[in-house]
């Protein structure tokens, strides 16, 4: 080792600076006024602007001419109908037209066919496209059949049963007119809709072309027409070509009973197929090979055929036939030959054949009795609807059970509203109007499709035809309906006998109509209340206006009430003395008037006195001026006048003196005229004038009560001042009348 060598210094290159990573703020110019405006904007306002940007799609749809034309056609059709609920059907059609979005996550669907490609591209053509004039042209039964058959074509495409445009599925529309529905020749299974199906007759002539310009494959319909002509019970015929089915049709052993699906098919028929049916003899041979009972027909070296009394039953048999063929092909490939297979005994498995059963568990009612294939077909229709196909299938039984209410509506108050406010981008919600309409439609459809409780079940004897015997069975179980809990509002820990007794008492009160205002308050029960007005005897002129139930003490009287009932004995005694003093003063005045009359000349004619309504003139003409010696009497008489008031009449009307005065006050009747003309002296004018004078003085005093000391009146008038009681005036009026 060299001593001059020194420790080498290892130098490394300076670390290279990491490349600058562009950040968000590097792309933003902080001095940009647009950026400053957005930064200073309120969060709610910024969110509103973002929502407006998202809703531009709606404005684009509304401005498109195609949407306007479709909307106008819908509205015109609704105006022509006029019997549907206001706007409900039109709103539903508009919603169906606009909500064509497909969910991002699809349920698991069968692989194969063009439908898988369409779903991957996000394009799905609706099955039920009957709108406007198309929906009016068909009745309800034909609409449902069109939707079912079009959905069947979509299922065949999803399962991979289609072979371009050559397979056919047909259904019988009308037994009387022998009309059938078939797909237009040249249309793929993924393109079939309800309106595109063609209606033909038994000879293959087109009755209704549908919504396409395509024709019908006459040669392909020949097989279907032969089956329909031989089997009136058949409503649907399916003819498909699958690789597994073609392989089994080429085997000499045919379909082996090695799987439950093969045993569920029943008796399998075979026919040596020699190409397109053009001869009538070939049709007769097919009808003979199929027979009156078989549901499955295998065409040698060609394909598979299944028939059914409904679309659901035909689908059930063709599905099991395809599955059985696939099982057999794979089993033979692994086993090496049919000799190495274990075959099932059909006699043992016939009673245990796979048939759809009723669901077990708690439900709102008795479950429907499913026909063959209905339950499976309905489940697949639910899958298509979830994928966005809009099949229009009438479901017989809802998949989700509606929970029964545990409590009464009055116990649990409403806490939320039934309205949903969803944005346009949210496809998982719908408007409450559409939701309620769909719920009503589902309830109506479920009620229409529900079978009777004692429905007839058709079963054969010893494997014979199902039509040979009809057996009526009772409904399984009792119909249960959700009802309110008994004794819901009865308090806990109470004796049920007491509750029943109280209930019986309430019922008796309702029957006897014994209803009161309820219990009285005990707050003021010990307080004594002084009543100023005491109800006494009620005096009336008629008993008709008084209800005896509330006023038992009624006195009928033609005169007024007694005014002295409220006075004491002392007050009555003072009043009697005062009346006597007034009577003595009136007698003295009468004596003075007679003396003056005697002193007057006898040949002076008598002045006719006016009627009692003008007593003032009589007082001025006839009453002489009194002497000054009577001032003492006037002074003693004057203080007693204010005590007399018209509100306190006296009951002492029965004095004989007052009765004589009343007779003197009466006007002369016509019958007394001859007596007045007699030569006997008539001292009538003087007493009448003297009696009229006090009344005139009374009226003057009533008009001017403060004029006692006025200089215009003489002392004689003050002395003659006499106030007649009010009860005396009333008696005068009654006597005059």
UniProtKB/Swiss-Prot annotation:
Phosphoserine sites (modified residues): 12, 59, 64, 334, 353, 355, 358, 366, 408, 427, 431, 436, 464-465, 481, 586, 600, 613, 678, 707, 710, 714, 716, 726
Basic residues bias spans: 715-737
Record-linked SMART domains: Aldolase_II
Superkingdom of source: Eukaryota
N-acetylmethionine modifications at: 1
One BP annotation, GO: positive regulation of protein binding
Topology in membrane: Peripheral membrane protein
Molecular function, one GO term: protein homodimerization activity
Keywords, comma-separated and alphabetical: Acetylation, Actin-binding, Calmodulin-binding, Cell membrane, Cytoplasm, Cytoskeleton, Membrane, Phosphoprotein
Residue ranges with Basic and acidic residues bias: 576-601
Keyword match Cell membrane: yes
Ranges of compositional bias, category Pro residues: 602-614
Tissue: Expressed in all tissues. Found in much higher levels in reticulocytes than the beta subunit.
Phosphothreonine PTM sites in chain numbering: 331, 429, 445, 480, 614
Ranges where the record places region Interaction with calmodulin: 717-734
GO CC, alphabetical: adherens junction; cytoplasm; cytoskeleton; cytosol; F-actin capping protein complex; focal adhesion; nuclear body; nucleoplasm
Chain intervals for the UniProt region annotation (Disordered): 1-21, 421-486, 576-737
Location of this chain's protein in the cell: Cytoplasm, Cytoskeleton; Cell membrane
Bias type Low complexity, positions: 687-714
Oligomer and partners: Heterodimer of an alpha and a beta subunit or an alpha and a gamma subunit.
PANTHER family: ADDUCIN, ALPHA-ADDUCIN
Annotated family: Belongs to the aldolase class II family. Adducin subfamily.
Entry function: Membrane-cytoskeleton-associated protein that promotes the assembly of the spectrin-actin network. Binds to calmodulin.
Record text about domains: Each subunit is comprised of three regions: a NH2-terminal protease-resistant globular head region, a short connecting subdomain, and a protease-sensitive tail region.
Name assigned to this protein: Alpha-adducin
Species name: Homo sapiens
Phylogenetic classification of the source organism: Eukaryota, Metazoa, Chordata, Craniata, Vertebrata
